[in-house]
Each structure stands twice: as structure tokens, then as C-alpha cells.
Swiss-Prot record:
This is Lectin 9. May be involved in arbuscular mycorrhizal (AM) symbiosis with AM fungi. It comes from the Eukaryota. Keywords: Glycoprotein, Lectin, Signal. It comes from Medicago truncatula (Barrel medic). Disulfide bonds: none annotated. GO terms for biological process: response to symbiotic fungus. Residues 1-23 form the signal peptide.
Length: 279
């Protein structure tokens, strides 16, 4: 009996130690904040040494401004075929796989798109939510806005992306516009917007400051965007679309901006940015 009791004690001790080792050295494959968590940030002035903003392609930070596309260093004029992206490195838990819960989020930013007074200009910029490891696509200049590649741009199953596009040139997949009227669109896995509204970019003064507000309500699943040009005399414009983000996005995403020029050019500058998400 004494020998049997000793063996049982040894076995129990072995199981305890094994469990302790497993719990000590196992690490989660993704961030694990609890439900009810909130992530927020506010950038009133961009810093080129900020560890939280990752720029790629032609995007750069200078004098407190995030420039998404490239300009000539001598003349300051925008360059053709420029593509840039800036991403906030904080992972956003946009929905929870276990509970099925969706996050609410809101973001606002000020921007300047300078067309240099040209009637024809392009191509635009986006605010987007995409996978944690989302590289800058090849051949994504022009109407692909630094977000899509030509081969899969119209195939939603290939693009786990949701974006608000500020599109200044009408391409073949855009709403018909004989006058090349710029538009704001909601993109769900495709460059072909699910909902659009006219963007009064050509009817405000050069270098006018625009203000955008984007919100997602997890109960109604409505994604909404409003854009205004304070002091311009133009009414705010807005568009919304109902989308279940769980059907498009991975559980964890990053948020950011992208932009592109093609044969036509303009500048795309983000002046400030705030974001908040709550799950």
C-alpha cells in the first residue's frame, strides 16, 4: 500500500508540473484583449518619428502632415504613378469569433486634396480596414487607389477589405459621370463601390480643408460617412451602407489610408486623425 500511495503522489506531481510548463510556454497566435475593451488614439499632428504609424510606398510625413502620394522635391508638384499607404500599427479587434460580437467604431480626419486648379485630376485616396498583414498591391496606381490590384479588384472573395474611397476620377467601374464628377464611395471587398455620393471637390477653393467623419454601428450594421468643407458654403455630403463586417473582414484588422495617382495627378494630405473602436 505504501508503494502504491507513493506512485500515485509521483503521478499527480508529474501532471501538475506538465500543466504548469504548458501554460507557461504556450503563447497566443493573436492579441487577446477581453470583450468590452476600447482602443482609441488621436493624432493632432503627425510625427515622422512616430512608432505607431507605418508608411509604405511613396507616403511620407513632413512638417506635421501625412502625405500619401509623392511630389517633386523642387517644384512641389504631384507626380504621376505614385502610390502610398499609411497604417496605424495597433491591431483592432473588429469582431469576436467566440461570441460573434461586432465592434462599433468611429474615425474622423481632416484632409487636403490639391488639384492645382486642373479640371481633370486623379486619382484619390481611401480610409480602409484590412488584414493585419496587408501589403501594398502591385500595379495599384491610378484608379486602384493603392488598395487593389487589377487582377482581383472586382472579386470580393479575394479582398478582405472595407474602405471609404474619395475618388476624383471616373473609371469604368465607377458610377457614370459625363462630367468626371468626383465621388465618395463605400467599397466592400471590391473597387466597385456599393454606395456612392458626389464629392464637391471641384467646387471648393484650392487647398480647401475637408473634414470627414466615418461611423459603424454594430447593431444596425450601418457604415456611414459624412464630409464637409467648413466655410465653403457647401452643404455636408454623406452616404451609408449596411454591411456585416464579419462577412468581409478577419477578426483582427489594421486601419489606415492609401492613395494613388495615375496619368493624372493631385496631392493627398492627411492633417489630423482620431479613431475609436469598442467591442
Amino acid at each position: 500500500m505504501a508503494l502504491s500511495s507513493a506512485l500515485i503522489k509521483i503521478f499527480i506531481t508529474f501532471l501538475f508540473l506538465q500543466n504548469h510548463v504548458n501554460s507557461q510556454y504556450s503563447s497566443p497566435s493573436k492579441p487577446q484583449p477581453s470583450l468590452g475593451s476600447t482602443i482609441s488614439f488621436s493624432i493632432t499632428k503627425f510625427d515622422d518619428e512616430s512608432p505607431n504609424i507605418f508608411v509604405k510606398g511613396d507616403a511620407s510625413i513632413s512638417n506635421g502632415v501625412l502625405s500619401l502620394t509623392k511630389t517633386d522635391k523642387y517644384s512641389g508638384k504631384p507626380l504621376q504613378k505614385s502610390v502610398g499607404r499609411a497604417t496605424h500599427l495597433t491591431p483592432i479587434h473588429i469582431w469576436d469569433e467566440t461570441s460573434g460580437e461586432l465592434a462599433d467604431f468611429s474615425t474622423s480626419f481632416s484632409f487636403i486634396v490639391n488639384t492645382n486648379g486642373s479640371r481633370l485630376h486623379g486619382d484619390g485616396f481611401t480610409f480602409f480596414l484590412g488584414p493585419l498583414h496587408f501589403d501594398l498591391p502591385k500595379n495599384s496606381s491610378g484608379g486602384y487607389l493603392g488598395l487593389f490590384n487589377p487582377e482581383t479588384a472586382l472579386i470580393p472573395s479575394q479582398n478582405p477589405i472595407v474602405a471609404i474611397e474619395f475618388d476624383s476620377f471616373t473609371n469604368g467601374w465607377d458610377p457614370a459621370s459625363p462630367s468626371q464628377y468626383p465621388h465618395i464611395g463605400i467599397d466592400v471587398g471590391s473597387i466597385d463601390s456599393r454606395a456612392t455620393v458626389n464629392w464637391p471637390l471641384d467646387f471648393v477653393q484650392t487647398n480647401a480643408l475637408g473634414e470627414a467623419s466615418i461611423n459603424y454601428n454594430s447593431e444596425s450594421k450601418r457604415l456611414s460617412v459624412f464630409v464637409a468643407y467648413p466655410g465653403s458654403g457647401k452643404n455636408a455630403t454623406g452616404v451609408s451602407f449596411v454591411v456585416d463586417l464579419r462577412s468581409v473582414l478577419p477578426e483582427w484588422v489594421r486601419v489606415g489610408f492609401s492613395a494613388a495617382t495615375g496619368e493624372l495627378v493631385e496631392t493627398h494630405d492627411i492633417i489630423n486623425w482620431s479613431f475609436e473602436a469598442a467591442l
